[in-house]
Amino acid sequence: MRMIRFRKKIPYLRYLEMQEKLRKFRRECILFLEHAPIITGGINYNPENLLLGKEFLESQGIQVHFVQRGGDFTAHEPGQLVIYPHVDLKKRNLPIRFYLENLLQSVIDSARTTWGLNLITDSDSPGLYLESNSSKKICSIGVNFKSFFTSHGVAFNLNNDFTAFRCINPCGRNWTDMTSVEKLGLDSGFAKRNQFISFMKANLNSFLGPISKLTHTVI
């Protein structure tokens, strides 16, 4: 399985096109990337959690799009590392619950090793939260399992400015519940980001099997 890191920000709609092609040919890979500012609503979205009108937001450079993934509204923006595993669960004989639990555990272990952060899950609200303050969310999750081939994934807040998050109640919560590595006073620079990605590769490898060398691309 290839791991690909994009050096340039990938438009969200471009990613949606990519994921459909990957699913069609059941081509496994794991993508690491950032998006330009966008708000997305999952299949369980509550309209009241979009605090400003779609037309106004788009006039401010924040796109709004509705997608086939679990969850409510969330946001993507520069400074947030998005990890999209595309995994053939049928071929690998992996139960959905096992996949989700191990995906989150990979993030938990990688964050602990990289920054000494202790993160926990919340059975009532998907994502990862600080163990020291369980109201503070640092990682969002939303996955699609169409045809037992995964798409979408997790979004980990490194040093994003939360401009897009201010326009929603992310997953029904107040945007001020969101935090990031930078807001916690920790190093969110390039070297630490690369270290986190390396640990993610190792942890994903532990339950998905052999993963090839990380590939960098500018497309």
UniProtKB/Swiss-Prot annotation:
Domain BPL/LPL catalytic: 24-212
Pathway connected to this protein: Protein modification; protein lipoylation via endogenous pathway; protein N(6)-(lipoyl)lysine from octanoyl-[acyl-carrier-protein]: step 1/2
EC class name: transferase
Gene3D superfamilies on file: Bira Bifunctional Protein, Domain 2 (3.30.930.10)
Residues annotated as site: Lowers pKa of active site Cys: 137
EC number: 2.3.1.181
Gene Ontology, cellular component aspect: cytoplasm
Subcellular location, record wording: Cytoplasm
Annotated substrate binding sites: 69-76, 140-142, 153-155
Domain of life of the source: Bacteria
Catalyzed chemical reaction(s): octanoyl-[ACP] + L-lysyl-[protein] = N(6)-octanoyl-L-lysyl-[protein] + holo-[ACP] + H(+)
Gene Ontology biological process terms, A to Z: protein modification process
Active site: 171
GO terms, molecular function: lipoyl(octanoyl) transferase activity
SUPFAM superfamilies: Class II aaRS and biotin synthetases
Keywords: Acyltransferase, Cytoplasm, Transferase
Pfam families to which the protein is assigned, alphabetical: LplA-B_cat (PF21948)
Primary location recorded for the protein, binned into one broad class: cytoplasm
Transmembrane segments: none
Similarity comment: family membership: Belongs to the LipB family.
Function: Catalyzes the transfer of endogenously produced octanoic acid from octanoyl-acyl-carrier-protein onto the lipoyl domains of lipoate-dependent enzymes. Lipoyl-ACP can also act as a substrate although octanoyl-ACP is likely to be the physiological substrate.
NCBIfam families registered for this protein in UniProt: lipB
Miscellaneous information on this protein: In the reaction, the free carboxyl group of octanoic acid is attached via an amide linkage to the epsilon-amino group of a specific lysine residue of lipoyl domains of lipoate-dependent enzymes.
Annotated protein name in UniProt: Octanoyltransferase
Native organism: Leptospira borgpetersenii serovar Hardjo-bovis (strain JB197)
